[in-house]
Amino acid sequence: MTPEIRRRIHAFRNALVLAADTRSNECFRMGRWQELNAFPHGCCDLASNFLAQYLQDGDPSLKPVIIHMETTEDFRKEYRSTIKSHVIVEVTGWFVDLTLNQFAEYQDRVVIDDRTGPLGTLLRRIHGSGGTATERSIQLDAGLD
């Protein structure tokens, strides 16, 4: 991943923090305001989809993919995880997560993973425990139910 893409990812997360912390009143009429207002908690779908769109708008060749993970009770017990469902972005072969720190077991505010770090490990463990990871296109208007 290029330094410029990394810079844009970090800048985007900073913009989400700013919007949620000091400008949320300006976003109140936005359809997904409830998600943004709780950032980073419960807004992985919003953050991932909006990041993917932002990256694609800046460079149409990137083609980011949204990955929705769902864990099992066995996974949560075995790994003492608080994750039930989570959404991340894959771009240029890298996993990107702006909200992983919403879960007690993770502290990093931005995770950019070449598949050998925490996100790659998380996906392998979810699959190994019978959970799912579904790839989909960018969906700005939808949210997780």
Language model regions located:
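A structural boundary/capping signal
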Residues: M1-D145
